[in-house]
């Protein structure tokens, strides 16, 4: 059989030999002995006979259906299987399956000269990649168009790119060798939309999604196709699109990331900065997928609004008092007292010049020219004292939201003493922000960026009068700008707390107590907040007592310590005489004026317990709650139940005395769990046994307690009397000042009966207390 060739040549990469080649030439070039070739020829004939007798299926029998072609991807080795001298067809255009008829005689393998050899799949792909322009036979009618190498293979077989636009692509833009993926078949079988032209699929991008041409899914619903960077849809489960945005994944989806929250085209930070809400904004809109309520719903339902990240700081709520007059607003005795207190009409604040009308919305403000329904005291009658919960007050408050004039008579208090010092949330009118003056109307910031002090609740800035008098040009004031309210506070509770602190501090007229002047609203100190509540008070440029102890403790002597202790006792005695307990005495809340005078400040934790001068009620008064710092808290505050806040202030004064001398605390906490406090209680009991009722020392030796044993002898007595573990046995501030050795202390500060007589105004008599001339100047001055 001269036309036969060895079986091991089938599937090799060598080109076919023509029939004209002689057997001698083939035998010479072959490396296999003749007997072996003869045996292999017998095996080849047996193989061909079984194939022709239908024992071995022809390659056409292995063709799969259209559904199997989409699911089971074919390879080049399957595409190049020869069949009946017919050109290769793509799976989409394959002829219908026909029954194979076996020929009468065996057909040799090389019967067709134009037939391609059966190459292995991997070798064929590598050959196509290395030789893109190689053809099997130049004269073959089934020769393929030139391939584009590895790039074409990756684009068609892996990335499923559409290469129909390329001039070298196969006919009709389809690959004759590689079947398309399932996603490609889904997109191909979907008919294009008649309204929108089909756009080419873009390349991979970093953004999450790209809006392409609109197509229709097999069920007829309009869908937006996605880019290849997103998950490709399948025919069984296409990607769901809603208004141009991808739907949110399920909460348990692993793809739930920050990029899934974006909306529109582009990446997370590519959205335009516009005021219109987006799906990521906190306000709900008809087209957004956010479940947060809209601002209009918040305003209508009165629900509490909590600012946070990516949310507006202040909810836009409609102001019912914007274009109405004060006479048409709801009124009550408490509302009018608050309006009168913050009006500036009393001689509590420095007026300056050019302030004929501090607040046009406040009828008690100087120079108010609006319509006023205030009546004289003779015509007021009993309706002036109507309680806020009475029917008259309720009707007037309910029907005066800007619809008409009120029937409630507006009666101003005669003086500040009629205004309560401790306000409740019901005392605050709903129009409180409109009657409180603006800080910029009277004052101006000295340095808008520098903070003189900062704490958990407020920051301190410096202001001066905007239009001062000739002798007020050098005056400087401290403005305490409060931070925002807590999340669990209402507006009424927040304003009542700030107003109560201001009402207490504005009545302080003592050289050792800081006085407050104005309660204002500002929008410049905290630019992010629309309205910041501020309190204007005396300015102490030398800082607080804690800074003096830390920085200049080595320069302070015995006389300095004694003078400062006496000034603290004086200021605390005055505060207690007004029926007020401070409840937060510590070095941080004791400031130093320009001349070295110590002044107590920060009445945020104070409690109004009785009327001024009521000593009987002061002893029996009780307070509730935990206030202050742990090292300065009295032991009764740390135990459940009520306590007398006046005695708690005396305990705190004893701890401040210890800090002045030793720059440290005697113990961390006044609790039995503290070992130092347990030792102190033992030393105090031993000390009390050797002293008589008047605290006169009988024995020459004292029980050893190092934190107290190093104090001077008279200061030891004062410390044990102030820091008595039993609250009712502690001495008061007045009793401490009456001690003989305390009265002998030379103090640089003037007494409470002496004030600045040359002050510009009556309210500024205690703005900068003078000092006395001493024989030996103190180092803290």
Curated annotation (Swiss-Prot):
ATP binds at residues 452-460, 480. Its EC number is 2.7.11.1. It comes from the Eukaryota. Residues 43-63, 74-92, 136-146, 161-195, 206-228, 379-406 have a biased composition (Polar residues). Pfam families: Pkinase. SMART domains: S_TKc. The modification Phosphoserine is found at residues 94, 253. GO terms for cellular component: cell division site; cytoplasm; cytosol; nucleus. The active site is at 584 (proton acceptor). Keywords: ATP-binding, Cytoplasm, Kinase, Nucleotide-binding, Phosphoprotein, Serine/threonine-protein kinase, Transferase. Residues 1-315, 368-417 are annotated as: Disordered. GO terms for molecular function: ATP binding; protein serine kinase activity; protein serine/threonine kinase activity. The keyword Transmembrane helix does not apply. Residues 432-742 form the Protein kinase domain. It catalyses: L-seryl-[protein] + ATP = O-phospho-L-seryl-[protein] + ADP + H(+); L-threonyl-[protein] + ATP = O-phospho-L-threonyl-[protein] + ADP + H(+). SUPFAM superfamilies: Protein kinase-like (PK-like). Residues 112-121 have a biased composition (Basic residues). Its main location: cytoplasm. It is found in: Cytoplasm. Residues 21-31, 272-304 have a biased composition (Low complexity). GO terms for biological process: G2/M transition of mitotic cell cycle; proteasome-mediated ubiquitin-dependent protein catabolic process; signal transduction. Residues 64-73 have a biased composition (Basic and acidic residues). Belongs to the protein kinase superfamily. Ser/Thr protein kinase family. PANTHER family: CELL CYCLE SERINE_THREONINE-PROTEIN KINASE CDC5_MSD2, SERINE/THREONINE-PROTEIN KINASE PLK. This is Probable serine/threonine-protein kinase C70.05c. The lineage of its organism: Eukaryota, Fungi, Dikarya, Ascomycota, Taphrinomycotina.
């Amino acid at each position: 059989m001269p036309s036969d060739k060895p079986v091991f040549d089938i599937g090799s990469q060598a080109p076919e030999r023509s029939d004209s080649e002689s057997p001698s030439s083939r035998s010479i070039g072959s490396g296999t002995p003749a007997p072996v070739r003869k045996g292999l020829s017998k095996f080849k004939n047996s193989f061909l006979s079984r194939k022709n007798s239908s024992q071995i299926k022809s390659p056409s029998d292995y063709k799969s259906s259209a559904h199997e072609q989409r699911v089971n991807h074919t390879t080049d080795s399957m595409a190049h299987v020869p069949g009946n001298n017919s050109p290769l067809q793509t799976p989409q255009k394959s002829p219908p399956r026909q029954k194979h008829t076996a020929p009468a005689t065996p057909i040799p393998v090389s019967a067709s000269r134009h037939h391609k050899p059966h190459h292995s799949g991997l070798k064929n792909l590598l050959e196509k990649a290395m030789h893109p322009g190689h053809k099997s036979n130049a004269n073959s009618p089934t020769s393929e168009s030139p391939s584009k190498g590895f790039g074409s293979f990756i684009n068609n077989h892996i990335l499923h790119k559409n290469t129909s636009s390329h001039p070298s692509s196969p006919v009709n833009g389809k690959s004759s060798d590689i079947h398309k993926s399932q996603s490609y078949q889904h997109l191909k079988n979907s008919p294009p939309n008649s309204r929108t032209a089909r756009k080419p699929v873009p390349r991979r991008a970093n953004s999450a999604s790209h809006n392409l041409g609109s197509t229709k899914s097999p069920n007829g619903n309009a869908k937006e196709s996605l880019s290849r960077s997103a998950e490709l849809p399948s025919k069984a489960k296409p990607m769901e699109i809603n208004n141009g945005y991808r739907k949110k994944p399920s909460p348990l989806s692993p793809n739930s990331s920050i990029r899934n929250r974006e909306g529109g085209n582009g990446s997370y930070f590519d959205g335009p900065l516009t005021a219109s809400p987006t799906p990521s904004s906190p306000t709900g809109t008809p087209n957004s997928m956010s479940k947060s309520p809209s601002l209009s719903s918040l305003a209508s339902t009165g629900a509490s609004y909590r600012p946070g990240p990516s949310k507006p700081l202040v909810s836009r709520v409609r102001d019912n008092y914007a274009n109405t007059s004060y006479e048409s607003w709801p009124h009550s005795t408490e509302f009018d007292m608050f309006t009168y207190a913050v009006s500036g009409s009393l001689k509590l604040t420095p007026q300056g010049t050019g302030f004929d009308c501090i607040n046009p919305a406040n009828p008690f403000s100087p120079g108010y020219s609006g319509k006023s329904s205030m009546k004289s005291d003779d015509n007021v009658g009993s309706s002036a004292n109507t309680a806020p919960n009475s029917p008259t007050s309720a009707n007037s408050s309910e029907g005066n939201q800007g619809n008409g004039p009120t029937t409630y008579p507006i009666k101003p208090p005669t003086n500040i003493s009629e205004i309560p010092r401790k306000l409740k949330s019901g005392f605050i009118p709903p129009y409180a922000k409109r009657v409180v003056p603006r800080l910029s109307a009277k004052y101006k910031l000295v340095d808008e960026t520098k903070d003189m002090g900062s704490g958990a609740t407020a920051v301190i800035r410096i202001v001066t009068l905007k239009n001062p008098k000739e002798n007020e040009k050098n005056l400087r004031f401290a403005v305490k700008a409060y931070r925002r309210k807590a999340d669990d506070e209402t507006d009424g509770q927040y304003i009542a707390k700030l107003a109560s602190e201001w009402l207490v501090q504005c009545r302080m007229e003592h050289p050792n107590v800081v006085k407050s002047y104005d309660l204002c609203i500002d929008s410049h100190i905290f630019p992010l907040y629309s309205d910041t509540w501020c309190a204007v008070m005396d300015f102490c440029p030398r800082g607080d007592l804690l800074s003096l102890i830390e920085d200049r403790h080595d320069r302070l002597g015995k006389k300095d310590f004694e003078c400062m202790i006496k000034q603290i006792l004086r200021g605390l005695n005055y505060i207690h005489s007004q029926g007020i307990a401070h409840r937060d005495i510590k070095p941080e809340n004791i400031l130093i004026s320009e001349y070295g005078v110590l002044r107590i400040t920060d009445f945020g934790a104070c409690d109004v317990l009785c009327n001024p001068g009521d000593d009987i009620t002061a002893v029996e008064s009780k307070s509730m709650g935990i206030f202050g710092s742990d090292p300065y808290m009295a032991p009764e505050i740390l135990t459940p139940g009520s306590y007398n806040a006046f005695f708690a202030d005396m305990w705190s004064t004893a701890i401040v005395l210890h800090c002045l001398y030793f720059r440290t605390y005697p113990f961390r906490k006044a609790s039995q769990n503290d070992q130092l406090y347990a030792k102190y209680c033992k030393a105090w009991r031993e000390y009390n046994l050797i002293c008589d009722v008047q605290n006169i020392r009988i024995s020459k030796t004292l029980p050893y307690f190092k934190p107290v044993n190093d104090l001077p002898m008279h200061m030891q007595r004062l410390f044990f009397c102030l820091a008595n573990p039993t609250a009712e046995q502690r001495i008061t501030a007045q009793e401490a000042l009456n001690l003989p050795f305390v009265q002998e202390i030379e103090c640089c500060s003037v007494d409470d009966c002496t004030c600045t007589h040359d002050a510009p105004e009556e309210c500024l008599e205690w703005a900068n207390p003078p000092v006395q001339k001493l024989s030996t100047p103190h180092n803290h001055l």
